[in-house]
Structures are given as C-alpha cells and as structure tokens.
Amino acid sequence: MKNYTIVSLIALSLLTAQTTTVERQAASDIIKKIDQLQSKIQPTQTARKMAAKKDRNRDKILKRVETLWDDQLRDLSDHIGQNPEIGFQEYESVDTLTKVLQSFGFSVTIGQAGLETAFVSEWESPAKGKGPTLGLFAEYDALRGTKEPFHGCQHNGQSPAAFASAVALAEFMEKQKLPGTIKIFGTPAEEMGPPAKVIMFEAGVFDGTDLIVRSHGTDETTRNKPGFGVCCLNINMVKYIFEGRPAHQRSSWNGRNALTAAVQFYTTVDHLRPTFRPEAVIQGVIPEGGVAPNVVPDRAVVDYYIRYPDEVYLAHMDAMIANAARGAALATGTKVTIDRYGEYRDGITVGSLEELAFAYAEKLNAPEINPEPQRPAGYEETGFVTRKIPGVSVSVYSSSAPGHSYERWLDSMKEVGHTGFLLDAKVMAAILYHYLTDDSFKKTVHMEHKTMADLFNNYLDALKDAYKEELGDTSK
C-alpha cells in the first residue's frame, strides 16, 4: 500500500465519500482523474450560464409547472400526506396518483416486476422521429410509526412534484413537435426492504431510459460533489432462517431447537464485532423465535443489516457472518437458509447534473442554500440504477424539522413544504428541458457518466488490491 500523510488523508476525506484509510488509499488516483474531468467540463460555470441565459420556452414551462401545482397538484400532495400507507401497501395512494396521471393523458401500467404497488406511466410525443426517453421517479410510501404510518420523509410531495414537471414538459414537446417519451416510475417502499428500485432495475423496468430525475425533502438546499458514495453505507440485508424439529419441552431431546441456534448465532455475531474494522455496523433482530413456551421452536429467524463504507470489505463481513450461522446450525443439529433479500451500494454522482440543479435552485431563490457541495451519493438510495443511467436528485429545503419526524410530516402540508415541492418540480423541469433541447449538454452528461462508471470499476479493483494483504484475494 502507498503511504499518505495525515494532511493529505484529511484533505481527501473532506472532498469525497471515502471515509476509511483503505478507501482513501484506493481512491487517491481516481479522485485526481475525477478532478481532471471536472476541470475539463467546468460544470459549475456551465450550469450558471445555462440558468442565467434568457429562454422564453424554459420560462413558460416553469410557469406552467407553477399553475399545475397551484391548481391541482398541491392538493394531491396534501391528500397523500393525510392518507399515509407503508411500503408495499400503498394501494390507495397508487390508485389516486395513477388516476391523476391518466387525466393528463399518460398511460398507466400498475404492477411491475412482481410489485403490486409499482407502476409505470408513459407519455409519447406524437411528433415523428427518435427522441430521448426522460424518466422521473415518484415515491409515495410512508414510514412505519409506533402509533400510525406517517410521511416523516415527505414522500407525499415527490409524486405530485414529478407530475408537474412531466406534464409541463409533455405539453411543451407536443406544441413544439419534439419527439421523445416521458416515463414516470412509481417506486414503492423506499423506506423498507427489499429495495423496490433494485427489483425493478433487475427486471429491466428502467431499460431504455436516458436520464432520470427525482426530488426529496430536505432541511437545506444543496447538491453533491461528483464521485461515488451512498447516504447510509453499503448494506446487505440478510435473513438467517433456522429450521429444527418440534417436540414437547418436557422431552426436548426429541426436538431440534431453532431458537437455540438463532441465539447462539446472534451471540457469535456479537463476539465477531471486534474482529471487524471499527467502521463496521451490524444491526439485528430476532423477529421469529417460536410460538409457545411448551413447544421446542422448530423455526427461528434472525434479520441483520450489515453495513460498511465499501462493498469489498462488506462482502468479507457477510461471509464471516454466514459462516457463524452455519456453525450455529451444525452445533445444534438444525438447518439454516440464508436469504440475502436486499442490497444498497455506492452510487455515481454526475457533476454536470448536480450543478445544473443547484444553479436553478439559486436562480429560483430557494431557501436555506448551503453553498458547499456535499459528499457524493447516488441520486437514488440503492446505487444500482445510478451505475447504468445518469440522473440527479433535486434537494430543495422543505422543512427545518428532523428527518423521519412527525414535525417534518406536518411541514409537508404547510407553506414551507409546498414551497419546497414546487421548487423541486421547477428544477426538475428545467433539467429535463435542457437535456431535451441542448445536444451539447446531453453529450456532456453521458460522457461524464460513462467516465465516472469506468472510474468506479477502477476504484473497486483498487479496493480489492488494497485489501489483499488483510483479506486475501477477494477477486475470486
């Protein structure tokens, strides 16, 4: 491994999402190449010029976004907010949202990739010729609360904001006879696993989409630096299902206790914690452990979220924990099935899109602007979609309350939330407009995204090499 001074490591940590020493060592050359790329395309300066330029068509689109919001979509946001439904159970929300889309002339297909509350809504320009396919993510799931579901992450505003952008742009395209397709992807259950976007991605639901935009409520107006990262560490969601044999507890030797296996496994994982690097996070519960004290439990389930800043070391942790589960099963005469039901990974951030979104947020006088770029994080929470399709998540201030709080939920139905969601819609519409009408910008976006994707693969190879002494050859 290369040697780095403390100063250089601190500097790198401020610029990137790479938080561990190994990550920073692996990423050092990659970061230089990212900086060279950004110097070449000048995303900040270019975005400010694009936003400042007089453009009657763009201004008409943004005005139409505002009219759509004021006339109908603000009330739709409040309606979804007042009727929260948790992930994979958003039936009424989907019914309401898709009926609104149909009223605007968008086709709707409910049920995607085996998910009943996922949908795709599509509008195709009547103009002849091949145009881009523009995508928007729409979320609508609520959080699980101790008393009731609630929209503490303000997902109630995301779909209406996306609708305002999409409809305004569709009307412009039809009037100007511009070819292209607009797709709104209804993605359920952002707040719980298994991650719906990964399921939809692997099923090919997003295939053929050229660009995806989305928005999300936040406590400041900001943007991310270009690079690789994820909001909440790389995650493996894993269930360990132990199966034994029931028996009366007075003759427990006739059974095989699945709960004993689960508890032994859970305890072993606790003993493993000091053997992992300090950045490792392991969070687990035992949601199933038998149904009656007088019956030997023949089924028990341990559910873990295994987290680490990079996916290479995460795979090592996953393998060690899986071995602990197999050992517990072997020791207790039970069987274990390992169900890896969800993954979240580093995503790719595209500077040209992030800076354009931020330039428009500034132009539109968004509140609580943080001028400092934040650490890279993919525009959607799983990371997988960002590696294939360029996109951006618009972040405009919509509440000062903590995330996942009842106060933020209430703010989503007040002026502070309404203002933030409307600005989200305008910024998304502006980004889509430029991508549709500016070939130079479109080429820059795809060139940057492809370059970043290649650099990300180089980064993963560098990580494997950096861990080789500690973990052995992880490429096998």
Residue ranges of model-derived segments:
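Sec-dependent signal peptide recognition
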Residues: 2-9
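Hydrophobic h-region of N-terminal signal peptides that target proteins for export
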Residues: 10-17
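Sec/Tat-exported extracytoplasmic proteins
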Residues: 65, 69, 77, 81-84, ...
